[in-house]
Amino acid sequence: MARQHPIQDYRNFGIMAHIDAGKTTTTERILYYTGKNHKIGETHEGAATMDWMAQEQERGITITSAATTAFWNGKRLNIIDTPGHVDFTIEVERSLRVLDGAVCVLDSNQGVEPQTETVWRQGDKYHVPRIVFCNKMDKTGADFFKCLSDIVDRLGAKPVAIQLPIGAENNFKGMIDLVRMKALVWNNESAGAMYDVEEIPADLADKAKEYREKLVEAAVELDDDAMAAYLDGKEPEEATLKTLIRKAVISGAFYPVLCGTAFKNKGVQPLLDAVVDYLPSPLDVPAIKGVDANGNEVLRHADDKEPMSLLAFKIMDDPFVGTITFCRIYSGILQSGTGVINSTREKRERIGRMLLMHANNREDIKEAYAGDIVALAGLKEARTGDTLCDPENPVILEKMEFPDPVIEIAIEPKSKADQEKLGVALAKLAAEDPSFRVTTDHESGQTILKGMGELHLDIKVDILRRTYKVDANIGAPQVAFREKITKPAEVDYTHKKQTGGTGQFARVKFQVEPAEPGAGFQFESKIVGGAVPKEYIPGVEKGLNSVLTSGVVAGFPVVDVKVTLIDGAFHDVDSSALAFEIASRAAFRDALQKGKSVLLEPIMKVEVVTPEDYTGSVIGDLNSRRGQIQGQDMRGNANVINAMVPLMNMFGYVNNLRSMSQGRATFTMQFDHYAEAPANVSAEVQKKFA
């Protein structure tokens, strides 16, 4: 079957926004007007087509990006719905990674909100061309012009209005199209399906003229011929102006701004027209870079004739189909039944069912082409960020980078049956979401869940309970302390048990000293003349190792210590490996006491990105958490603060930072080193654990 839609008619785009800006409602309306949805799903009734997980329908926020295919004016739209909550930014990152363009939705009442800044920065990182839709123009306090100034002040970007609102709040009737210089006015009877194209109202004529001039001036800057014609007094024709706006969007020179109210069905069709007219096709964006089998950089162009390559950007567990892997095909043609290689993991796979997804419905297809976004059922090895490609032409496409988790909790299943279900469920959840990690604490034997924030882990626990029917207790977050000696110590210890029958005898003399940070445990025997026979040395080491797991301060593992066996004695009959193990254990514990053992705590490297206004509060708060500020610098129009902070003082920080900065600051943290805990902290921990 040949390709039905030329690749230049594809628009792979996402809708990005702050939580509650009306992103899912906008997507719903797009699906409605492109004829994919017969009944509009309202988010606040918990029934939106894109928000199909039970957790999303209850909370009314979008958690999983669902991919949907629709058509408008003969163009094929692949829409990815992205979440707007800070704990789900990983979802936004991986969506932006495979998109060619995006619509940024703003709440006209709120303007640019905190999460808008975060997703905008991610869009900048991946150079995603964007248009802006000022939604909720019918809301009290809606202000289109404040949105324009916010984009300049808070995003450091250049907005250019291509529409102006007619009326606002309850009187919002439609918009002036500055490209065509016509008024688009909706009649309320047709659920927004019909609107009239009229002359611009007289009271708005001057404003329309002023903003039309701004638009034309910004557009002609991109083309010398158009600029020369404009300076000669020639206005660009509509087709020329659209070409120039498209050029601006693709190059990032400026961002066209539209307005409307998705909920009241006004302005969605012109938004779709703008997606088709101004957002790039796969041919308009740079070819994706990759690395071939020899480590050389290669390019894969959006072309059916090139070797097949695709990137897995999302894994989902579907109750009917099993594991579904969402992929963007960057080059070549993919057919069901073909063998592919997962070049990231060097594993071979066979393509079984291939599906086009529409929110929660699916359509089986046999063939997909460069530029398509498809769902593959039944892949065993693929993980998010993996490359699948033609075995004859292996390539690894640009990898996605995922942040390390910043919060962890312990989970304990309530019964044996839950224990078995938990293992399977956690493996699936970790495969679906690279920012969610599962580890086992070797010291406590507990299963530890790590994630991007408290809401992130709440939702994972909720999925465990609902989808996988696992009942479990959730613990409070914990810190992994360590212990270390601070000065050298020498001990001479004799273990003697000789009361008739086979006795026990062993004498050991150790020199114990602190080792370099990160050196771990080092053991050396300097025995000469057979004072301790060779066959007993393993017993000595076993005794020492048994103490390492539980030190003398508060029972935490001992690190960075060197033990030298310098002398000893044995008995021909009563000595054994066990006797030397017991002697070594007691001697080592004595040495740890004599060597003034201290408690070590993990220190985290913390980076906070905050608007200038909150810098003082953020630094003050980090200082109150025993943080040491390492430096500050500017990134765009945000301030970046680097600090070293003890992990035990970082619990709950994500929520504190959010409220301190009205959600506008973000942070990342990773383990850096262990450092001696202050006496008061050590005393508190000893009281709790020892």
Swiss-Prot record:
Fetch the InterPro entries from UniProt: EFG_II (IPR041095), EFG_III (IPR009022), EFG_III/V (IPR035647), EFG_IV (IPR047872), EFG_V (IPR035649), EFG_V-like (IPR000640), EFTu-like_2 (IPR004161), G_TR_CS (IPR031157)
The record's annotation in Pfam families points to: EFG_C, EFG_III, EFG_IV, GTP_EFTU, GTP_EFTU_D2
Q: Which UniProt keywords apply?
A: Cytoplasm, Elongation factor, GTP-binding, Nucleotide-binding, Protein biosynthesis
The tr-type G domain extends over: 8-283
- For this chain's UniProt record, which GO biological process terms are given? ribosome disassembly
Lineage, top-rank taxon, reads Bacteria
Q: Name one GO molecular function term.
A: GTP binding
- Per the record, the major location class is cytoplasm
Localization of this protein: Cytoplasm
Q: Where along the chain is GTP bound? A: 17-24, 81-85, 135-138
Please give the GO cellular component terms listed in this UniProt entry. Answer: cytoplasm
> Which PANTHER family has this protein been placed in?
RIBOSOME-RELEASING FACTOR 2, MITOCHONDRIAL, TRANSLATION ELONGATION FACTOR G-RELATED
Entry-linked NCBIfam families: EF-G, PRK12740.1-3, PRK12740.1-5, small_GTP
The UniProt similarity line reads: Belongs to the TRAFAC class translation factor GTPase superfamily. Classic translation factor GTPase family. EF-G/EF-2 subfamily.
- Cited function: Catalyzes the GTP-dependent ribosomal translocation step during translation elongation. During this step, the ribosome changes from the pre-translocational (PRE) to the post-translocational (POST) state as the newly formed A-site-bound peptidyl-tRNA and P-site-bound deacylated tRNA move to the P and E sites, respectively. Catalyzes the coordinated movement of the two tRNA molecules, the mRNA and conformational changes in the ribosome.
Identify this protein by name.
Answer: Elongation factor G
- Species annotation: Afipia carboxidovorans (strain ATCC 49405 / DSM 1227 / KCTC 32145 / OM5) (Oligotropha carboxidovorans)
Gene encoding this polypeptide?
fusA
